[in-house]
């Protein structure tokens, strides 16, 4: 009898407590005019965003919050990404690059779309976390290549301040990715301008060579 009463008591207590709500988040798309790459025909440089690599501690659906120093992190079981983080990063980068290359009618797309590309951008995330009401940080190694040859590469570091909520932190992280996308767009346009100038130089030399008369 006591065992039955104990079970009833446990069930009653369980009914008094509701399970915590799990919140899901996605990275914010960059602001700007209509930048849907699928709706426009690229006439300028076309960039494929290669699959983004993440450090092991970020390869999880739960969000990661850094606690005060460089070694202490907290895994948030009730705050989760609503999309694969690497895919979300590629999405924000491609949209930002497309927006920032619009003056040259350039476009950037994740490689998985299968769209034709002149350049490939590789991004390896080394650090991408923060804390609500504190700092958010991004560190990423990147490279831009064409025809299998690396044209430019570097390490991008930036940080910002987040508001008090988890959503505020995601907004701040999205802003950091937008900064990286702008840097990649600027690099792509510079590399493409250099390639175009070199091609014009080769065409000019070939034209001059073809125009010489034989004696």
Region roles according to the model:
Residues 94, 98-102, 185-193:
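Sec-exported extracytoplasmic/periplasmic mature domains
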Residues 70-82, 149-186:
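Short secondary-structure boundary motifs at beta->alpha junctions and helix caps
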Residues 1-16:
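Sec-dependent bacterial lipoprotein signal peptides
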Residues 17-34, 42, 95, 100-148, ...:
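Surface-exposed short loop/turn segments
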Residues 77-101:
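Structured, soluble extracytoplasmic/luminal domains of envelope-associated proteins
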Residues 46-52, 64, 120-124, 137-143, ...:
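Soluble periplasmic/extracytoplasmic beta-strand elements of cell-envelope proteins
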Residues 16-85, 192-215:
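A structural "domain/chain start" motif
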């Amino acid at each position: 009898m006591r065992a039955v009463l104990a079970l009833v008591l446990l069930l009653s207590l369980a009914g008094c407590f509701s399970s915590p709500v799990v919140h899901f988040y996605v990275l914010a798309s960059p602001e700007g005019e209509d930048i849907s790459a699928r709706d426009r025909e690229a006439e300028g440089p076309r960039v494929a965003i290669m699959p983004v690599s993440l450090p092991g501690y970020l390869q999880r659906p739960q969000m990661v919050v850094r606690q005060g120093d460089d070694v202490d992190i907290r895994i948030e079981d009730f705050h989760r990404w609503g999309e694969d983080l690497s895919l979300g990063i590629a999405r924000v980068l491609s949209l930002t690059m497309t927006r920032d290359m619009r003056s040259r009618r350039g476009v950037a797309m994740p490689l998985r779309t299968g769209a034709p590309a002149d350049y490939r951008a590789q991004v390896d995330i080394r650090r991408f976390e923060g804390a609500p009401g504190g700092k958010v940080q991004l560190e990423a190694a990147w490279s831009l290549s064409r025809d299998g040859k690396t044209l430019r590469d570097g390490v991008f570091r930036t940080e910002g301040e987040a508001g008090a909520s988890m959503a505020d932190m995601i907004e701040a992280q999205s802003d950091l990715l937008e900064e990286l996308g702008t840097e990649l767009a600027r690099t792509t346009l510079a590399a493409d301008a250099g390639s175009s100038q070199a091609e014009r130089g080769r065409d000019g030399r070939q034209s001059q060579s073809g125009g010489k008369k034989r004696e």
